[in-house]
């Protein structure tokens, strides 16, 4: 419905990242009519496992997409966290790296609803309003969805929110990583900590009222910190984790 019948092709990559070689392999894999014709590459920044693409990695991907006539879209649901973590200007990991379109996330950073679509390739923006309406994305009170962005982008609020979330995740990582039975699954780079925990420990934490997902393999958990996470809550979770482990 949203993509008008497009097909999603998955590519392998370390730490949740696409690579130029992986993109090229997908383009050249087959060229017959019974195989989807690649047209757009989409990267998630940060990735689904909490790692970030560096400007150098994105420039290499951007060059490969241009080589094969592909568009480059960035899923930036947590884009602010990536910018805060890398300490770079937003342009360095978007249009200067070859990104054509950015989905700039707000709901992960303090806005109640709504994301922003930023076109760097203005040709792609032609009649976008019609396509947004066709996909059911036109709200009758759009001004109420747009207004929070004024406050979010003013005076660097969006980066302060993201930096705080990242800092809370750093604290969480540092408190729980030394605990016996805790295995860190991916490098902590933004506002997420991915850990493997024993099943009884997971259940014990749930029983104490802590909420988190465990959809990553056997015992893999995603622990997220947000713009309003408090340090005392991070320390309380770490203390409960140690108690559940018996450390």
PLM regions and their residue ranges:
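Conserved PLP-enzyme active-site core in the AAT-like
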Residues: 1-208, 214-229, 237-245
């Amino acid at each position: 419905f949203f993509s008008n019948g497009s097909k999603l092709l998955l590519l392998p990559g370390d730490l949740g990242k696409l690579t130029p070689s992986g993109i090229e392999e997908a383009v050249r894999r087959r060229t017959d009519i019974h195989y989807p014709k690649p047209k757009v590459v989409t990267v998630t920044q940060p990735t689904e496992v909490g790692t970030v693409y560096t400007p150098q990695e994105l420039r290499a991907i951007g060059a490969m997409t241009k080589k094969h006539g592909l568009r480059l879209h960035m899923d930036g649901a947590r884009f602010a966290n990536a910018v805060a973590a890398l300490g770079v200007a937003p342009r360095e990991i978007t249009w200067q790296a070859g990104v054509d379109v950015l989905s700039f996330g707000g709901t992960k950073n303090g806005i109640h609803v709504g994301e922003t679509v930023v076109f760097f390739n203005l040709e792609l923006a032609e009649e976008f309003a019609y396509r947004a309406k066709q996909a059911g994305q036109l709200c009758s009170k759009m001004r109420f969805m747009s207004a929070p962005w004024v406050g979010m982008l003013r005076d660097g609020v969006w980066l302060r929110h993201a930096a705080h979330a990242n800092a809370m995740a750093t604290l969480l990582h540092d408190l729980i990583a030394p605990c016996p039975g805790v295995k860190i699954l991916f490098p902590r780079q933004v506002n997420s900590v991915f850990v493997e925990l024993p099943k009884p420990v997971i259940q014990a934490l749930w029983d104490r009222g802590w909420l988190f997902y465990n959809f990553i393999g056997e015992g893999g958990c995603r622990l997220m910190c947000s713009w309003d996470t408090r340090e005392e809550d991070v320390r309380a979770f770490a203390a409960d984790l140690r108690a559940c482990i018996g450390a």
